[in-house]
């Protein structure tokens, strides 16, 4: 079996290509989920202030027998905190029981309040101080990203966006790549696989490779060069989602999955959300 792949970000830091998402998990659930994930081999955990489970993540990490430098921990600056990223980060670090973050992401641009450029400047300062190794964004459209770059000269290393077979965001993914921004997929299984796992091509590939539909979709993300963070609190599924290193999809198979794209957004519109 091949080793789990890592991605080198444009700032020189590296991150695992596959991590555990903990959206909607309670503090109690997240402790058990992370314990299982670390046991299986995950080293990247993606949380957020808005998930209200940073304390659970912190407890799980504190109890883990994995060295801090082997872990890659991400959390996110919530919309209400865009005016005070320093205070928000310090609160997150306290809950996570960490001295530094591997990745700090601005959760949404919230153009209605128009603080995202100033928030980004604050995040740049936090990175310079060593409180955060890498900084990036979530849910930013091309015009939001361009403005950040134009006004600060600092490009996010990650743009974490809704991305799954029904919403492939190929134009944004390509723009990110051109600007050396790594695209990361949230809701990678289209919220439990509805409308995806029952697609003929997914079922056929699952049969061909002796894998589950979820494993096929996760492998699709990996083979498209995306960082992917499937969310689960179910031990068997956490293990299943990580058992994807012993096969690859070929170019034609990736092309067949590309045909499933409907531009079907399941989450909020980044131009409208918040404010």
Predicted regions and their residues:
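Acidic-and-aromatic substrate-binding clefts and catalytic sites of carbohydrate-active enzymes
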Residues: 25-28, 46-56, 78-85, 111-114, ...
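Short, acidic/polar
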Residues: 25-38, 81-97, 143-146, 167-168
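Alpha-helical scaffolding within the catalytic cores
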Residues: 2-7, 55, 59-62, 87-92, ...
